[in-house]
């Protein structure tokens, strides 16, 4: 009924073209190419064709140029910088090392000509590979004459500098750098910031934003010398540049460069200081040149700038070497003609113990935090729990730890800290100004390079002076009613009030010397200091009346019978060691001040007054001391009168570990102290810490329970280690109408153990409050750390359970650094004094000066 339809067979598209053809049988050893293989083959052929074209261009078109460059060999002197000496703590822990890195350099004279594609290729390749930043520079030659300060001030405004002191410092830096540089680098920017500053700089003559590569090339005084573009380049980037070196004329790579590294971190920054790029002013300094006027330093060398790195520069830097080589036109060495190997610097081993230094620094920072929180922030923190530390009032201080037996400096902590690693490759002007204009001055070592009124800690030495001059004895007693009232010479009805710190409680009553030290009575020491003397025009000798602070009433009349300023000066300056440098191996040590009438007349053109003497008697007024001076003099009380020069250096060693020079203990002075006088003062200091009414013994909590101030050094249940000390609170700042002051410095100085002294700890907090409340807890932690070091207390409370890793017994200059071919060892006797090695014969190591 229905016809069937014939189905049309379906052929896949790939088989239709073969329809009707006989199938081709393929052998197993035959290779058949599809379309992809043909494309790949074409790409390979094209690549080889391009390579052949480039090679043809180089060999045929540019062949003569490359042949001439290769044949153009010259002889060149290449200086070799010595390995800088390393620095270790007393246990051999590394404090300053040399880290081996890759560096990229440029020889401006070997760069292709300006304006050529080859020059731009080199420039863009290096900038891209190294990610070089844009920098703001001033060209002094392009600034109109007479407009320098105006332009520089506008640059300061451009950078956002607002404080007058900051701007003045910026102007000073730019002015000095303009004397020695074609271009003065001011700051560097990210890629996002650069366009904004570039646009703003167009309105200022002589000011421009350029890449660091261009700055380094244009600022080079000697184009034939290589200049460091960047140090600490990754190996991958260095290898990439090395592989393309044929296309980068003028660019050199060095895989043996050393960068100074400070593994101990910021806790050692004030002791070590830092190195930084040498500037022309330093190169031209006669102290940094040979007798023939040749500088020890090349243009891109580093030099000690601060701390031990500066003080011991001549020892650490070693002796420069170099080699004469033959180089081709591309700067590649082809033959060594002559070599004078550099001599490495000597290593230094310090008296500092890194564990104790770190513990002292931590205790100091925590103590400042507590001082601010306890005095100012309790109520504020309730409202704002996230209050930042930078809003706190007290922000600076110091801790000094000395061995009383030999003057060894075991710890020298200063706060605030700073990052000395930032200076190694050259700190930016902006960051440097941040440091220098910080009101707490982080770059200043508060322990040795700054001085302050010492407050009642001076009473230790006033007591010794009074006993020595026989103005007081063991039985001397004075009554404190809360203060004294001293009438004017010209008007007995008017006068000045001098209060005791315990004025709110009505004073101390009648005290002898030991009790006056124990309770730190100011009135007692007003009497020790103020002399029996009749001022010119006065009706009678210097006198005072008892003052009752609560009612402002005056009581009985008393005549002074004390030392007077001249005897105070003679004892504090000429017997003890105030008002003069201690000689510690650090630059810029402050000397303090022991004032006298001649000094005041020279400075203020005023005569000396009884009030000046009264203030000096309790460590205030004009008197100034460094925390280091206080520690040195406290050590003399502990050891029986020996004033040691504080010693930071134990020895120097060469790269073989052999001792070259040992720094011996040095006595500055032996103070003749009578045994009975010394016993009285020591007893007073012992009572300060160990008697309930002593200012450093304890404090009552909210429940009226007396709580010890020594929970770390002398915890309950353990054998007590007796400590002797003296608190101090120096009032400073604006004087209020009631005779008190706005701020006060906190001090505490102590030694331990009492019977057989080993250690002195001195604590200072700038504007830190009362010494008994805020300096004593810091000393408690530091003493505990020392006791843990010596085994007198178990480790783990302050120090780690396990000790910090100890370095090699005899570390080498290349410790932690792999250097091919060890440098020649330093001779045991001294450095090579030949002119070739640039050693200054007029300044041997033992005569290093500030």
Annotated model-derived regions:
Residues 801-805, 847:
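Ligand-binding clefts of soluble mixed alpha/beta catalytic domains
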Residues 119, 349, 353, 357, ...:
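Short, charged, low-complexity patches
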């Amino acid at each position: 009924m229905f016809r069937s339809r014939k189905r049309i067979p379906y052929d896949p598209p790939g088989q239709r073209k073969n329809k009707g053809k006989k199938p081709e049988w393929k052998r197993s050893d035959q290779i058949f190419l599809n379309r992809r293989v043909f494309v790949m083959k074409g790409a390979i052929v094209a690549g080889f064709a391009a390579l052949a074209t480039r090679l043809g261009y180089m060999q045929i078109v540019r062949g003569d140029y490359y042949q001439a460059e290769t044949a153009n060999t010259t002889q060149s002197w290449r200086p070799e910088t010595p390995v800088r000496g390393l620095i270790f703590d007393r246990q051999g822990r590394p404090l300053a090392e040399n880290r081996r890195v890759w560096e990229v350099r440029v020889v401006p004279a070997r760069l292709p000509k300006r304006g050529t594609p080859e020059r731009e290729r080199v420039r863009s390749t290096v900038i891209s590979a190294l990610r070089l930043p844009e920098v703001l520079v001033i060209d002094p030659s392009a600034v109109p004459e007479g407009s320098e300060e105006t332009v520089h001030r506008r640059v300061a405004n451009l950078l956002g500098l607002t404080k007058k002191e900051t701007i003045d410092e910026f102007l000073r830096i730019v002015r000095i750098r303009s004397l020695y540089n074609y271009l003065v680098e001011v700051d560097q920017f990210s890629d996002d910031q650069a366009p904004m500053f570039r646009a703003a700089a167009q309105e200022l003559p002589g000011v421009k934003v350029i890449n660091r590569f261009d700055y380094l090339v244009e600022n080079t005084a000697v184009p034939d010398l290589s200049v460091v573009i960047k140090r600490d380049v990754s190996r991958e980037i260095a290898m990439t540049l090395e592989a393309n070196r044929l296309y980068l004329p003028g660019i050199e790579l060095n895989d043996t460069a050393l960068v100074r590294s400070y593994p101990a971190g910021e806790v050692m920054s004030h002791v070590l200081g830092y190195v930084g790029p040498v500037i022309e002013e330093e190169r031209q300094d006669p102290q940094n040149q040979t007798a023939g006027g040749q500088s020890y330093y090349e243009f891109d060398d580093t030099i000690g700038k601060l701390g031990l790195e500066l003080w011991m520069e001549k020892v650490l830097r070693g002796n420069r070497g170099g080699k004469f080589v033959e180089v081709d036109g591309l700067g590649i060495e082809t033959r060594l003609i002559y070599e004078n190997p550099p001599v490495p610097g000597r290593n230094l081993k310090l008296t500092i113990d890194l564990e104790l230094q770190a513990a002292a620094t931590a205790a100091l920072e925590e103590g400042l935090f507590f001082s601010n929180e306890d005095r100012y922030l309790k109520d504020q923190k309730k409202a704002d729990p996230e209050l930042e530390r930078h809003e706190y009032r007290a922000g600076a201080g110091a801790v000094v730890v000395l061995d009383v037996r030999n003057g060894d400096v075991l710890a020298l902590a200063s706060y605030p800290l700073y990052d000395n690693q930032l200076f190694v490759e050259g700190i930016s002007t902006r960051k440097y100004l941040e440091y220098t204009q910080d009101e707490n001055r982080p770059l200043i070592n508060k322990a040795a390079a700054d001085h302050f009124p010492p407050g009642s800690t001076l009473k230790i030495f006033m007591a010794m002076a009074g006993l020595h001059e026989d103005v007081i004895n063991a039985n001397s007693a004075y009554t404190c009613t809360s203060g004294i009232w001293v009438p004017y010479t010209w008007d007995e009805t008017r006068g000045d009030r001098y209060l005791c710190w315990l004025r709110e409680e009505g004073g101390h009553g009648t005290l002898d010397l030991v009790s006056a030290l124990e309770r730190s009575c100011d009135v007692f020491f007003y009497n020790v200091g103020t002399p029996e003397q009749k001022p010119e025009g006065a009706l009678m000798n210097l006198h005072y009346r008892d003052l009752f602070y609560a009612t402002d009433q005056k009581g009985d009349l008393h005549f002074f019978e004390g030392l007077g300023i001249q005897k105070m000066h003679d004892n504090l300056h000429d017997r003890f060691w105030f008002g003069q440098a201690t000689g510690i191996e650090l630059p810029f040590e402050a000397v303090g001040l022991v004032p006298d009438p001649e000094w005041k007349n020279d400075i203020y053109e005023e005569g000396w007054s009884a009030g000046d003497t009264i203030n000096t008697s309790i460590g205030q007024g004009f008197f100034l001391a460094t925390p280091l001076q206080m520690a040195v003099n406290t050590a003399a009380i502990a050891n029986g009168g020996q004033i040691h020069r504080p010693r930071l250096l134990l020895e120097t060693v060469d790269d073989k570990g052999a001792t070259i020079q040992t720094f011996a203990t040095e006595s500055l002075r032996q103070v003749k102290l009578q045994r009975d006088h010394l016993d009285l003062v020591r007893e007073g200091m012992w009572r300060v810490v160990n008697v309930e009414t002593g200012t450093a013994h304890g404090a009552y909590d909210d429940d009226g329970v007396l709580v010890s101030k020594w929970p770390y050094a002398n915890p309950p249940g353990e054998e007590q280690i007796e400590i002797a000390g003296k608190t101090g609170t120096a009032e400073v700042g604006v004087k209020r109408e009631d005779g008190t002051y706005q701020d006060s410095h906190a001090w505490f100085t102590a030694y331990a153990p009492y019977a057989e002294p080993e250690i002195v700890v001195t604590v200072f907090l700038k504007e830190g409050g009362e010494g008994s409340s805020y300096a004593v807890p810091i000393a408690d932690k530091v003493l505990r750390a020392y006791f843990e070091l010596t085994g007198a207390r178990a480790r783990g409370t302050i120090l780690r359970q396990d000790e910090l890793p100890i370095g090699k017994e005899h570390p080498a200059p290349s410790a932690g650094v792999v250097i091919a071919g060890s440098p020649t060892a330093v001779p045991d006797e001294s450095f090579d004094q030949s002119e070739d090695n640039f050693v200054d014969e007029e300044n041997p190591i033992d005569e290093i000066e500030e």
